[in-house]
């Protein structure tokens, strides 16, 4: 997380969640999101132009915006930010100058999911594993989607939080059964090193399905993760078994991460896969498999609750929370 310059009095915040295809923007006013719009990145040569068009669409003056926080896909450092899946580049100095900003904050897109977890209401969460969260302990955020995002949220007291981004999606994929090992061998033949992300992602779900079909002598009927999910929902036994295995592997990876960071404050699942198949996920063996391990580690995990985040725009909310905390810290 990086910020620049000082806050001016009485300004209005703008937040963005920028992906490879779309950029979502909103105003941040009174610690709430307003005027959410989705724009196509391909329609704008530079992100500054997208911001200007967004403000024009909602009838807001650029002059009223003094603070911006953008969630960006990829590691955020001090240098200019180059998006990996679109043509945009953010030059910090040029961005601030063109929009007349006092404050610019860039954060990793998955970090905003962690920020959002500090603010979500009960109607934006579905509890999938019962437990008792310890308010003074870390929370774990994990999300299989295009990749496997992992991060943690640390309470600092006084309503303040610290987000610790990491590369937890690239830990080794755990193998605990003969079927795990057979699938792992198929992944290793394709990729060499088998990280958790190789299985717990959109591409991973498809790879698990293809390998599973080969192991069982079943014809492949899907060419995308979405098709695997659709087959499972339609009652296809092979696809359903793969989706179940996906959820069980997610349970073990999430449980391992809780053990590593001491996330007794609970686990928050996000990403594009689990919320899409929420009913099937709730019916899966995830909750039991999460703590099914050795005596000591199983006891440690036994009372850790798990939620699925169902908020419509958690990236924007998280960007707003990150911006608010940065501004409050400046006084």
From Swiss-Prot:
A GO cellular component entry from the record: cytosol
Gene Ontology terms describing biological process: glycolytic process
Substrates-to-products reaction catalysed: D-glucose + ATP = D-glucose 6-phosphate + ADP + H(+)
Gene name in the database record: glk
Domain of life: Bacteria
Entry EC no(s): 2.7.1.2
Residues given in the record as ATP binding sites: 16-21
UniProt keyword annotations, A-Z: ATP-binding, Cytoplasm, Glycolysis, Kinase, Nucleotide-binding, Transferase
SUPFAM superfamilies in UniProt: Actin-like ATPase domain (SSF53067)
Nuclease among keywords: no
GO molecular function annotations of the record: ATP binding; D-glucose binding; glucokinase activity
Entry protein name: Glucokinase
Keyword Iron carried by entry: no
PANTHER family referenced in this protein's UniProt entry, alphabetically: GLUCOKINASE
Family to which the UniProt record says this protein belongs: Belongs to the bacterial glucokinase family.
Localisation per UniProt entry: Cytoplasm
InterPro entries for this protein: ATPase_NBD, Bacterial_glucokinase, Glucokinase
């Amino acid at each position: 997380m990086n910020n620049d310059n000082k806050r001016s009095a009485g300004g209005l915040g703008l937040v963005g969640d920028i992906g490879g295809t779309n950029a979502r923007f909103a105003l941040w006013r009174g610690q709430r999101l307003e005027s959410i719009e989705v724009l196509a990145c391909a329609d704008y040569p530079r992100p500054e132009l997208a911001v200007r068009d967004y403000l024009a669409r909602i009838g807001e003056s650029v002059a009223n915006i003094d603070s911006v926080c953008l969630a960006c896909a990829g590691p955020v450092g001090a240098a200019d930010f180059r998006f990996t899946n679109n043509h945009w580049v953010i030059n910090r100095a040029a961005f601030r100058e063109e929009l007349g900003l006092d404050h610019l904050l860039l954060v990793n897109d998955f970090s905003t999911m962690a920020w959002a977890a500090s603010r979500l209401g009960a109607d934006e969460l579905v509890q999938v594993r019962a437990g008792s969260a310890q308010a003074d302990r870390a929370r774990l955020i994990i999300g299989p989607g295009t990749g496997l995002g992992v991060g943690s949220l640390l309470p600092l007291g006084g309503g303040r939080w610290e987000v610790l981004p990491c590369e937890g999606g690239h830990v080794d994929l755990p193998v605990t059964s003969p079927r795990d090992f057979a699938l792992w061998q198929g992944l290793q033949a394709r990729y060499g090193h088998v990280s958790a992300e190789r299985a717990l992602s959109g591409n991973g779900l498809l790879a698990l399905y293809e390998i599973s079909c080969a192991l069982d002598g079943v014809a492949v009927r899907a060419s995308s993760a979405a098709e695997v999910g659709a087959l499972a929902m339609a009652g296809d036994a092979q696809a359903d078994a793969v989706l179940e295995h996906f959820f069980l592997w997610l349970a073990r990876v999430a449980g391992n991460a809780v053990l590593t960071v001491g996330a007794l404050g609970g686990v928050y699942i996000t990403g594009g896969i689990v919320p899409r198949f929420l009913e099937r996920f709730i019916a899966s063996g995830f909750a039991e498999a999460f703590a099914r391990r050795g005596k000591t580690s199983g006891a440690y995990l036994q009372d850790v609750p798990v939620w699925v985040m169902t908020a419509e725009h958690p990236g924007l909310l998280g960007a707003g929370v990150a911006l608010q905390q940065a501004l409050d810290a400046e006084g």
